[in-house]
Structures are given as C-alpha cells and as structure tokens.
C-alpha cells in the first residue's frame, strides 16, 4: 500500500503520461533525462502485472489507459513511434522509428479490447483455458503462486460485448466489474488453492413498456 501510494503520487512517480523512471522529487531527476526523468513503457508493463497480482485492478487500468492514450496522441500528431516520453512536454523523444519496445502497447490494447484475451499478473497460472465459439462462455483451471500469503488478485477477460456476464470461482459467485461492454475485471478470492473459473452469459428480463 505504501509503495503504491509512492508510485501514484503526482509529486513522486506519477505523471500525466505515465510512471516516471525515477522519483520526480529526487535530486538526480532531470526534466531532459533519458533514464533518469522520462516515461518508458517496459517498466510500466511490469508494474501493471504486479498491480493485477495485488488486486489493484483500477490502478492497473489507470497505468494501461494512460500509456495507450499517450501513445495514440503522439502517433496522431507526429506519425512516429518514439522510444520514450518527456514528462514536461508530454511528447515523444529519442529515436523516432523505435518499435522495439512497442509490445507493452500491443499487450495493453489486447488485454482490454481484444475479444478472447485473458490477462493476469505473475502469480496466476492458467491451464485448460477455453472460450465457446461466440465468446459468451469461458472456463479455465487456475493455480496460484503459493509462496505468498493468500490475497485477492485481478484477472482480465474479454468476452463478447453483446452480453452481460456472471463469474464464479469453484462454484461461488465472485466480484467483477467493467470499464466497457465485454471487458470483465474479475477479483479472485483471497486463496492460494487451485480452482475453476467460469464466466457465463446471463439474460436479464426486460418488461414490456409499449
């Protein structure tokens, strides 16, 4: 909790274009820095995965959407794929045709928008993962890293956006939320015991109003 507060403090690590490489209050922070005062995507991807492990789904979404918006804005304005971003100007910098570090952008987009994509942190291991043909049902066997104490973790599942869904783990309904139709941000229970995750479409009765 304390570390998360540091990461998302606008006086320290958090900026309008993402997480700084170093604390902005540090004496070695530079406004024209390369690695000591800029925003890169690879280290943010690792933070994003860790936030999913900690059950901090909203914070993970904040990291991913800020990165996607930053990338989209720069690409629209310059048509370039820069290495990193300067915090003060919020613009891309470094080599302008640098696609070598673009995989975090692709992974974030897929995690929140590509139907049939399942995303977890480092502590959740999925086996026997299966969607039905129209992506309205999903089942998976899930195991956890038992070297840590049991705690809530977040998993993202992109379903068919035309339906609403109920999520169960080992037969019990678990919490889920969405930022847009089809995306499920699922909060797994505080356990290290393996189990079965099921996502099923639900039908809502709509009374006749004519």
Language model features with spans:
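Surface-exposed beta-strand/loop patches in extracellular or lumenal glycoproteins
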Residues: 145-163
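Short strand-turn-strand beta-turns centered on an Asx-Gly dipeptide
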Residues: 168-172
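Solvent-exposed loop and beta-edge segments used for protein-protein assembly and interaction
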Residues: 41, 132-136, 159-161, 180, ...
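Glycan-association/targeting regions that enable binding to alpha-glucans and other polysaccharides
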Residues: 121-125, 147-152, 177-179, 185-189
